Amino acid sequence: MLQYQIERIDHQIADDRSQTGTFLIGPLERGQATTLGNSLRRVLMGGLEGSAVTAVRIAGINHEYATIPGVREDVLDILLNCKQLSINSTNPELEIGRLVASGPMEVKANDIQFSSQVEIVDGEKPIATIQEGHNLELEIHVERGVGYRPVDRKSEETTAIDLLQIDAVFMPVKRVNFTIDETAVAEGGTGRERLKMEVVTDGSTSPDDAIAEAANQLIELFQPLATVTMVEEIPEEPEPSPEAQIPLEELNLSVRAYNCLKRAQVNSVSDLMGFSYEDLLEIKNFGSKSADEVIEALERIGISIPQSRTSV
């Protein structure tokens, strides 16, 4: 199997602490770059676990369309700013951060007090602007999850009236692009490919770690296929019907037909079900009249046999 190398050719950290990594993977057989690129992109964009703000409580506020006295931003703006926070929580359970601030003050993400298990990636992210003589109290809920989780309106009705739910985006990877370079040529002129992949994260994880986690998920997905053992199912023998157990004597056949069948080792209806009309005619001293008699007797108990034997 062709061995390829992975090289990170660029790594950048933006002002908002988001990270961009560019990777070159190759050489690959033709078609493998597309397979790798599509598989990694799908897991990177929707399969990685991340952290997100899921709810906010604002003192004195019980709905998202309100305004806060002495605060420049309305509630919707504050919720949006909280939703856009890049956060990394190592706690699988709910984490709650708190903020109590007095104006004049521009509240930033770093002003929110969390436990040591929560890291705010972009501490300079603005949250709200408080005017002099006014206060702002926030409670911010952070959870871990995968993908996108919209607000559940049914559960929202059972939560505290002042806890404002937020559509949660747990995806730590913001964008993935890849291109395929088909110019690489191996010895002997065989065509090769290289995969160039750009991964942009929100800063809560690095592009290197994101690709490693995506690859591990794909390995776990495909690993069972490598050890699949195909077990041939042996079909169960169908249970004979009650009619098949009827002895030959109970068909009330003529003495001639009965004796001919007995000499042919036919002792029950089950034995007769293996015969066709043509097979009956081949029994010694068994004519068409006797064959018709057998057919009629079988039909009386709901059993029919084919007119001719099945060709193999």
Curated annotation (Swiss-Prot):
<feature type="region of interest" description="Alpha N-terminal domain (alpha-NTD)">
    <location>
        <begin position="1"/>
        <end position="229"/>
    </location>
</feature>
<keyword id="KW-0240">DNA-directed RNA polymerase</keyword>
<dbReference type="InterPro" id="IPR011260">
    <property type="entry name" value="RNAP_asu_C"/>
</dbReference>
<comment type="subunit">
    <text>In cyanobacteria the RNAP catalytic core is composed of 2 alpha, 1 beta, 1 beta', 1 gamma and 1 omega subunit. When a sigma factor is associated with the core the holoenzyme is formed, which can initiate transcription.</text>
</comment>
<comment type="function">
    <text>DNA-dependent RNA polymerase catalyzes the transcription of DNA into RNA using the four ribonucleoside triphosphates as substrates.</text>
</comment>
<dbReference type="GO" id="GO:0005737">
    <property type="term" value="C:cytoplasm"/>
</dbReference>
<dbReference type="GO" id="GO:0003677">
    <property type="term" value="F:DNA binding"/>
</dbReference>
<dbReference type="InterPro" id="IPR036643">
    <property type="entry name" value="RNApol_insert_sf"/>
</dbReference>
<dbReference type="Pfam" id="PF01193">
    <property type="entry name" value="RNA_pol_L"/>
</dbReference>
<dbReference type="Pfam" id="PF03118">
    <property type="entry name" value="RNA_pol_A_CTD"/>
</dbReference>
<dbReference type="GO" id="GO:0000428">
    <property type="term" value="C:DNA-directed RNA polymerase complex"/>
</dbReference>
<comment type="similarity">
    <text>Belongs to the RNA polymerase alpha chain family.</text>
</comment>
<dbReference type="Pfam" id="PF01000">
    <property type="entry name" value="RNA_pol_A_bac"/>
</dbReference>
<dbReference type="GO" id="GO:0046983">
    <property type="term" value="F:protein dimerization activity"/>
</dbReference>
<keyword id="KW-0548">Nucleotidyltransferase</keyword>
<keyword id="KW-0804">Transcription</keyword>
<feature type="region of interest" description="Alpha C-terminal domain (alpha-CTD)">
    <location>
        <begin position="240"/>
        <end position="312"/>
    </location>
</feature>
<protein>
    <recommendedName>
        <fullName>DNA-directed RNA polymerase subunit alpha</fullName>
        <ecNumber>2.7.7.6</ecNumber>
    </recommendedName>
</protein>
<dbReference type="InterPro" id="IPR011263">
    <property type="entry name" value="DNA-dir_RNA_pol_RpoA/D/Rpb3"/>
</dbReference>
<dbReference type="GO" id="GO:0006351">
    <property type="term" value="P:DNA-templated transcription"/>
</dbReference>
<dbReference type="GO" id="GO:0003899">
    <property type="term" value="F:DNA-directed RNA polymerase activity"/>
</dbReference>
<dbReference type="InterPro" id="IPR011262">
    <property type="entry name" value="DNA-dir_RNA_pol_insert"/>
</dbReference>
<keyword id="KW-0808">Transferase</keyword>
<dbReference type="InterPro" id="IPR036603">
    <property type="entry name" value="RBP11-like"/>
</dbReference>
<dbReference type="InterPro" id="IPR011773">
    <property type="entry name" value="DNA-dir_RpoA"/>
</dbReference>
